[in-house]
């Protein structure tokens, strides 16, 4: 899910929700000789008496979603000597995880994440995947809206706009200004929720009218439970480093000025302003392009049923594949599946790590794509006769179920036929788990009913339903204590001797598609460092 309309710097990524294969097949132990501790080797052979095949490799990446694919790409492009022989295994018959792009009758829509922030790491992945010419960027001047008191109100895109927008009262703006300068209650000395941090630093209006809907758009979460440190760490660090949000901002600016500037890759595009990106044929182009480059290293319909530690070092992973049972022996393993899936797979290795990972929560979210004729848009919502903007967010206090709406056909070109408007709507989340009991028709009705309150003319014809995708376990919630849970899981694996077994994915790196890519580069560095040490053992 991705509705980061207030600042296009965080987009969320719907995680995979395939159920863990809790039935761990027990096979008779087999004595296998494998050059796991030596130089990089790869090969396959029949397992004598086992009726299957064994493969030896440097690194196995479990999960062919965007995190797993990007880790493989990062290793191949940035650390080619670390794990020259690697494989990416995916239980489904396609790559991409929750990136699902559909195209039909002149419409092109997303049923998972909708876009990404074009940061340099993201653009590096785009260029290395051969997609530079397919990149499309939204208009950085396009407005974003928040529903308040029955009206869609624009959100300021820069500080100089603050005095002039009507989403907040004069008193609310003054309270936010003083708080940002440090004239506010002191920190409580414990981990704060997003709600606690924002109300203390910026006041009630900023929280209720800006941050609460922002949390719904990014995490589909409850800001009274989300951790400020874990969910919005960059803002949290401003107060930590500078004594206040403004103080931290100036300090960060000064540090950037004094820091040595690395030369920017000349291959990368130069986006103008703060915007979001996609591709000519939708987000699916990225996982498909990476998979094509990896070729036979990507294994589809490979279901991991068990993982054990080898006495000689490394790991043995047992897979059920279309070609039968396969045993993979690898020096390192990266788990990029959702935390609840990883928990089931890792329980035989570490009860403590599995218990920690099982605590993470993923609420349900539905992505509802519908279309209206252009004339269905209310006149007061048009700019120069057109629906313009990124989209709109809906605070939970405003009497609508829908978390927010992306103006898909306004954001990127060629998303809808002439005369039609394409809207991607998200509904559900931590505060509305009841969507799981609703049919597709009921979800469309709920979204349509909400839109007629502020965007669509009440007497317009029924919308054209394009797609309804329900994600029962959608977005990992970075709740208070999230980092403690991750630390427990990682330290439990390390203390039990499971070196070279890494945790990755959006519950580790962050829910934004861009953060998954940045996290992939970070994980690739970890694997490279481990493999460098491994070579000298």
Swiss-Prot record:
Coiled-coil boundaries: none
Cofactor binding comment, as recorded: Binds 1 FAD per subunit.
GO molecular function annotation: oxygen-dependent protoporphyrinogen oxidase activity
Location of N-acetylserine modifications: 35
Cofactor: FAD
Enzyme Commission number(s) from the entry: 1.3.3.4
Subcellular location: Plastid, Chloroplast
Any one biological process term the GO annotation gives: porphyrin-containing compound biosynthetic process
Family: Belongs to the protoporphyrinogen/coproporphyrinogen oxidase family. Protoporphyrinogen oxidase subfamily.
Name of this protein: Protoporphyrinogen oxidase 1, chloroplastic
């Amino acid at each position: 899910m991705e509705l980061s309309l207030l600042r296009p710097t965080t987009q969320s990524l719907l995680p995979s929700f395939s159920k863990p294969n809790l039935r761990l097949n027990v096979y008779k132990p087999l004595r296998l000789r494998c050059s796991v501790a030596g130089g990089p080797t790869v090969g396959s052979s029949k397992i004598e008496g086992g009726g299957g095949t064994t493969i030896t490799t440097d690194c196995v990446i479990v999960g062919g979603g965007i995190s797993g694919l990007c880790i493989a790409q990062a290793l191949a492009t940035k650390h080619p000597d670390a794990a020259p022989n690697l494989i990416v295994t995916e239980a489904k018959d396609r790559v991409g995880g929750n990136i699902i792009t559909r195209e039909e009758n002149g419409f092109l829509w997303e049923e998972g994440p909708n876009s990404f922030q074009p940061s340099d790491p993201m653009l590096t992945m785009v260029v290395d995947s051969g997609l530079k010419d397919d990149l499309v960027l939204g208009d950085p001047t396009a407005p974003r809206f928040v529903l308040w008191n029955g009206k869609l109100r624009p959100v300021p895109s820069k500080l100089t706009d603050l005095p002039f927008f009507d989403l907040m009262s004069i008193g609310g703006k003054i309270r936010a200004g003083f708080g940002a300068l440090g004239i506010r209650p002191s920190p409580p000395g414990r981990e704060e929720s997003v709600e606690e941090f924002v109300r203390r630093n910026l006041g009630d209006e900023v929280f209720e009218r800006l941050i609460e809907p922002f949390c719904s758009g990014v995490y589909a979460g409850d800001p009274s439970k989300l951790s400020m440190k874990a969910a919005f760490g960059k803002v949290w660090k401003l107060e930590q480093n500078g004594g206040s949000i403004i103080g931290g901002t100036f300090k960060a600016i000064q540090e950037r000025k004094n820091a040595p500037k690395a030369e920017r890759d000349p291959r990368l595009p130069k986006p103008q302003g703060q915007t979001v990106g996609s591709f000519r044929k939708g987000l699916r182009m990225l996982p498909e392009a990476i998979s094509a480059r990896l070729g036979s290293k990507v294994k589809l319909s490979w279901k991991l049923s068990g993982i054990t530690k080898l006495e000689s070092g490394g790991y043995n992973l047992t897979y059920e594949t279309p070609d039968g049972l396969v045993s993979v022996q690898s020096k390192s393993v990266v788990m990029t599946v959702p935390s609840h899936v990883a928990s089931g797979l890792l329980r035989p290795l570490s009860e403590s790590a599995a218990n920690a990972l099982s605590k993470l929560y993923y609420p349900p979210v539905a992505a509802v794509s519908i279309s209206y004729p252009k004339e269905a848009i209310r006149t007061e919502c048009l700019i120069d006769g057109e629906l313009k903007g990124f989209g709109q967010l809906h605070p939970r206090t405003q009497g609508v179920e829908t978390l927010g709406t992306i103006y898909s056909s306004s954001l990127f070109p060629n998303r809808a036929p002439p005369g039609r408007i394409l809207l991607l709507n998200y509904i559900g989340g931590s505060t509305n788990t009841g969507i799981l009991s609703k049919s597709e028709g009921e979800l469309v009705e709920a979204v349509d009913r909400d839109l007629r309150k502020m965007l669509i003319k009440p007497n317009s014809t029924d919308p054209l339903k394009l797609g309804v995708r329900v994600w029962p376990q959608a977005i990992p919630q970075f709740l208070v204590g999230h980092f403690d849970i991750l630390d427990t899981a990682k330290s439990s694996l390390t203390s039990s001797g499971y070196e070279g077994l890494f945790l990755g994915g959006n519950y580790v790196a962050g829910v934004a598609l861009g953060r998954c890519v940045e996290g992939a580069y970070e994980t690739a560095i970890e694997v490279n460092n481990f493999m460098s040490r491994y070579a000298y053992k």
